[in-house]
Amino acid sequence: LGATAALATAITRAFFDFFERDLTDKELLYFANFSENITHGRASGIDVATVNSELPLWFIKNEPMEQIELNFSGFLVIGDTGVHGFTSQAISIVRERICEEKEKTMHQISKLGLLAASSKEFLMSNQLPELGNVMNEAHDILTHLGVSHPRLNAMVKTALANGALGAKLTGS
């Protein structure tokens, strides 16, 4: 959810404030990404860009990030399982699935891309039931890909049992 990017941004701003130096957006992104690379190895820069953006960002690999305006009257609730996950582990699991069942896994990955595109439209047009359905379907696919966790699945089940329109896992 960008916690380390937010911390890197705050620390960078604090240092520049302490030394009474002006900080350009370019410098802020440079130093915050530098910190992220130390923390994560090879960070994408997405989290730093997101925490420093006035609007949500839409990201597709190898395309420029796009700021999007939300028209959203619902609530998003974020829960933490306490389980530490690593993107690199999830990637390894999916790579293994591709080796084992290439056609099926690639279809699931493609479907996740289509669901993500739909979610963008639903967020921008306040289509909450449709967004919930997309989240549920995406979580099911991610579970079948092997990147979920029993605690996550229990939280999703609890959220849905208590009136949530949708629920899915996200990164840490």
Locate each region found by the language model:
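Short, conserved micro-motifs enriched in small and acidic residues
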Residues: 2-6, 43, 106
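DPxDG-like acidic metal-binding loop motif
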Residues: 2-21
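C-terminal nucleotide
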Residues: 18-23, 30-42, 48-169
